[in-house]
């Protein structure tokens, strides 16, 4: 090597060379009779210096390693002792250990109630005197309709005869058509003749209040339903595997189409409306008659979820008009809407995000005009509980009304039907859970925070001082080492919008030590997920933290209750998952708490959280160093239609591909453990297996856990143990205790 900066000739005729070197942080000088000799001597000097330094560094490294080993021995993480403590936490910090913590309220009448406590003894189960169930059951009732799985679409073919308002007649479905007859079966008449297997009439028949009309939807079912097939590898009933099938519509699949039809009972006149206002259905709900016996109202959710209408069909003219229309460039969150008719069906209370915040509106049915916005402001109505027309009050829950409080806290409120007199019935700065009596004049309210023990009070709607009924006493669990999680806020990606979350620490926390960080993620969308109530034990987090981790959970952009724009970040972009906000939040926490080692950050989640945790190491592997993902909907084209088209839109386009963990699997450069239940009836297990296939083809190293007989799961105790070991190995850099050794200590 020839590195030098200066060559000069000395007075005695020799030459000297000088070079700057980073080895010693200074200069080396060498001399020689010739330039070549000086350079050679300098190179030899450099080599000797490097060898000497390497010997010294090796000696220093050995001393540091010995010191580190001693330190780890004194305060190791992920040890058998940590596992033992973690296993004890569910019982040690059980809710039953907190006296005065109300678990439920049962109103006997308007003034009498019973409180139930978590500390109450568990009720003894009554012994069953029934004979053991046999494989075959015979009844006198004949064939019965099988219980419908929650994933199955209701075909509306089943239904008992519907009596008329005066009980003299019945309407029913026969041979796919609408029939009426006297109650005794006489004078049977067909009101429709065009019903077929491929276009039949719904059994949900509606009589007009005056008995003049009946209404039923003509249904055009999908031409071919999609099914997911499962192989139950290890059934309890037999040795050989069992094949199961489950109806399972996916994004882009055909949808059932409905046309509300009206039949005049006396004349048989049919009113078949033009479907221009409801032609491209994701779904159609109703119909239902208004009190005037002339107007049939139904709700139309357009495919793609950008248009939602409340429509009215006139029984005389057959014309359809729009009473309410909601539109959005992204999505209308149809699962959040609320509608209730008041004032003899002449007005409707309607809930909408049309001004970016979820609020209540008063709508005139005849004109479709908005009469008044009943609530307004940069906060959200969460749920309408009760409408009392006599008192002119709407009872509802809300979040974000108080700017100096956690915006996710739930409060119970009332507002007048005229939009005046907004009141917060539960003013304490905490998360509230209340139960009203039947007349909505009193409520029992339990309020708490993640770091504040619960208090239960009795309130009156009219006001007055609340009566304290119970206070949670946490002294027992505190004496055993319980510590509340820390409520922590920090700006997200934009540098200004606060993100709210929790920081969990182990019971033996020592701020002088360094801790790996693990995030528990479920970013939805459709809700908020960070616990706001007091918890003595968090099932997925507390025991994991006890191994020697800092575990965090937060709600970031893409989740609910912070305004529509906050949630719309997810639109056609589920891969975002609020991860830029989460990374900023964790970095801010680590800046305040240097013991949080953000060079060792892991992440885990289930379902959507499974998709998001895998996505985190694929697209943000520079920050997230390991991921555990259970039952993930890794490719939104593979998951259920209703959840994915709501957030990813329709038709299925390139955004689905861009958000797919299958498409991005080749990016994996971090440890990843995938877990799936072979009978998952929520997320198609093939979603996980297709990621596995892509990882194998890309030559990536990963771990896979398949649980026989399990459904949508984080893996239970087995999955938890695998998750513990995974993070101990990859974030702590130590081998976890052998399972057999842990069993010996149990």
Mark where each language-model region is.
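Short loop/turn segments that connect beta-strands within beta-propeller blades
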Residues: 183-186, 265-268, 315-318, 365-367, ...
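Surface-exposed loop and turn segments in beta-propeller and other repeat-based domains
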Residues: 89-94, 141-150, 189-198, 251, ...
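A short, exposed loop/beta-hairpin motif centered on an aromatic-Gly-Thr core
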Residues: 24-37
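Blade-terminus and WD-like Trp-Asp/Gly-His loop motifs, strongest in beta-propeller folds
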Residues: 105-110, 161-169, 204-213, 286-296, ...
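Beta-strand-rich domains and repeat architectures in extracellular enzymes and scaffolds
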Residues: 90-121, 155-162
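A flexible loop/linker signature enriched in serine peptidases of the S9 family
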Residues: 119-123, 154-157, 168-179, 193-201, ...
